[in-house]
């Protein structure tokens, strides 16, 4: 049975035992890693984000956005059925959390910013400050039209489980009479990073 193979699930803060001699040798054949190190339940960025945003009580939640994006909501009660779109995880203290994860967030936007970096380097700017570049472009987006000047972008860089595609194809389109400028270009790519 799989239950006999997997370790028992523990809550953050529980003692999970100590590293055995056999385990130390498996992890570090050189012998530098010593046995006896106390172990604790593993924690990842999702749990860390919940704690950092104080989103650990029922009916609270947080969003983590980067190359991918996910929303985590601490559930008031258990779901009545299975939803393919929702992964169930727990808070560090064991409360049930509904997590929706998307592979696409800033990857396409990052690719465009890197294109601007390459452009600057071709004009002799060797050491491009990426913080300044992102800041400049993001602030420029604030000057864009509310409708992004008629520009349209689909930030479908990677495939998504929910759509059934293993690969994505990002897309940027405009009409001949769209208000095509830097502000609208950046604004539409910021919009699509979180909304497409």
Residue ranges and their predicted role:
Residues 1-3, 10-196:
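Active-site core segments that coordinate phosphate-bearing ligands/cofactors
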């Amino acid at each position: 049975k799989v239950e006999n193979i997997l370790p028992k699930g523990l809550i953050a803060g529980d003692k999970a035992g100590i590293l055995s001699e056999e385990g130390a040798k498996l992890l570090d054949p050189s012998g530098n890693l010593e046995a006896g190190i106390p172990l604790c339940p593993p924690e990842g960025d999702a749990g860390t984000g919940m704690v950092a945003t104080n989103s650990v009580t029922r009916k609270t939640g947080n969003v983590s956005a980067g190359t991918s994006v996910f929303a985590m909501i601490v559930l008031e009660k258990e779901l009545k059925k299975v939803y393919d779109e929702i992964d169930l995880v727990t808070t560090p203290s064991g409360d049930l959390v509904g997590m929706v994860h998307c592979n696409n967030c800033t990857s396409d936007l990052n690719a465009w910013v890197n294109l601007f970096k390459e452009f600057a380097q071709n004009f002799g700017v060797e050491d491009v400050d990426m913080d300044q570049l992102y800041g400049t472009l993001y602030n420029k987006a604030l000057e864009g039209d509310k409708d992004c000047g008629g520009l349209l972008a689909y930030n479908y860089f990677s495939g998504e489980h929910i759509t059934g595609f293993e690969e994505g194809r990002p897309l940027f389109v405009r009409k001949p009479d769209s208000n095509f400028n830097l502000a609208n270009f950046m604004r539409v790519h910021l919009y699509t990073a979180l909304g497409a």
